[in-house]
C-alpha cells in the first residue's frame, strides 16, 4: 500500500513525498528491496497506489501511466491532521474497501497467503498517532524515530501527536474515527486487507509496526479478524511491544528491522516454506523407531 501523508508538512520526516513515488516506481520495475527478497521466495509484489501525492518521478514518468502498479488512488495524499482530519469518512471507507477488494482479487487468482507492506513518507507518525489513540496511551510510548530523526525531531513528533489527540479528543473516539482523523490511506487499506483475510479465509502475514496498527484497528472494528493474521517480525519502533501484547501475538523474527516495504513479512515466507516442508515430509520418532520423548512443559 503506497500513500502519502499530509502531516509531513510539520517536518516529521527527513524525506520528501517524492520518495514515496520513486520507491513505488522501483517496486513496479521489480528493483526495490522487497521485490528482490520476494523473488527469492517465489512471491509476487503488487504495489498499490492508494494515495501517492506526486504525479511524476524524476525521470518524468507519470505514476498513473506506470505498468506494474495497481492504480487505486483515493486522493493525492491525506490532509495535515494537525490542521484538519486526515481524510473524510467516505475516503476512509473507500480505502478499507480497497484493501478487502485486493484480498478478494488474490483469492480469485488462487493465491493462498498474503503479506502486507506499505510505503509512505510520514506513516510512522500516522501509525503512532493511531496506536496512541486506540491504546489510550502516552504518545511517547509508541512513537519512534521512523526513517531517522534527531532527538529534537522525535520530541516534536511526539508533541504534535499528543496535540492532535487532545484537539480531537481521540482517547474517547472509536477506532474508525481515530483512523480517519489521524491515519493514512495505507493504514486504512491494510485494515481492509486484514478484514479481507477473515472474509475470504486467507492468512495474512503482517509486516512491521504500521501493519500491526492496522491489525489492531481491524480487530477492534471486527473482533475475530486476528485469527487470520500472522505476525512476522519485531521491528525497531517502540509501539510493537504494546501492539503485540494487545493482539496477543508473538512475532517470529527479532531482527530490529526498519527497512519497511513488507520486507519482514516476506522473510517469514521462507521460514514458513521450511516449516511446511518439514511438516509434510519430515521423519517422525516412530518412523525412526525411537521412543517418544515425555513432555514436561
Q: Across the structure, where does each feature detected by a protein language model lie?
A:
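N-terminal loops that bind phosphate or other acidic moieties
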Residues: 1-297
Amino acid at each position: 500500500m503506497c500513500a502519502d501523508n499530509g502531516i509531513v508538512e510539520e517536518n516529521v520526516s527527513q524525506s520528501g513525498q517524492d520518495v514515496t513515488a520513486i520507491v513505488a516506481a522501483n517496486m513496479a520495475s521489480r528493483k526495490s528491496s522487497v521485490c528482490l527478497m520476494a523473488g527469492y521466495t517465489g512471491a509476487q509484489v503488487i504495489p498499490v497506489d492508494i494515495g501517492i501525492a506526486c504525479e511524476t518521478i524524476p525521470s518524468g514518468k507519470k505514476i498513473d501511466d506506470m505498468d506494474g502498479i495497481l492504480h487505486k488512488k483515493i486522493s493525492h495524499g491525506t490532509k495535515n491532521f494537525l490542521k484538519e482530519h486526515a481524510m473524510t469518512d467516505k475516503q476512509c471507507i473507500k480505502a478499507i474497501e480497497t484493501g478487502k477488494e485486493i484480498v478478494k482479487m488474490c483469492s480469485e487468482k488462487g493465491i493462498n497467503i498474503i503479506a502486507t507492506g506499505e510505503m509512505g513518507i510520514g506513516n510512522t507518525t500516522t501509525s503512532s498517532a493511531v496506536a496512541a489513540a486506540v491504546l489510550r496511551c502516552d504518545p511517547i510510548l509508541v512513537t519512534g524515530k521512523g526513517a531517522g530523526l534527531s532527538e529534537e525531531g522525535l520530541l516534536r513528533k511526539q508533541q504534535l501527536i499528543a496535540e492532535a489527540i487532545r484537539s480531537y479528543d481521540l482517547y474517547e473516539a472509536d477506532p474508525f474515527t481515530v483512523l480517519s482523523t489521524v491515519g493514512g490511506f495505507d493504514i486504512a487499506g491494510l485494515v481492509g486487507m486484514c478484514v479481507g483475510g477473515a472474509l475470504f479465509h486467507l492468512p495474512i502475514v503482517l509486516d512491521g509496526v504500521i501493519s500491526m496498527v492496522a491489525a489492531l484497528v481491524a480487530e477492534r472494528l471486527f473482533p475475530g479478524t486476528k485469527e487470520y493474521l500472522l505476525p512476522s517480525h519485531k521491528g525497531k519502533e517502540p509501539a510493537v511491544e504494546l501492539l503485540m501484547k494487545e493482539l496477543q501475538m508473538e512475532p517470529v523474527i527479532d531482527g530490529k528491522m526498519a527497512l519497511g516495504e513488507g520486507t519482514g513479512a516476506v522473510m517469514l515466507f521462507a521460514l514458513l516454506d521450511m516449516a511446511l516442508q518439514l511438516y509434510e515430509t519430515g521423519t517422525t520418532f516412530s518412523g525412526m523407531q525411537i521412543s517418544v520423548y515425555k513432555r514436561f512443559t
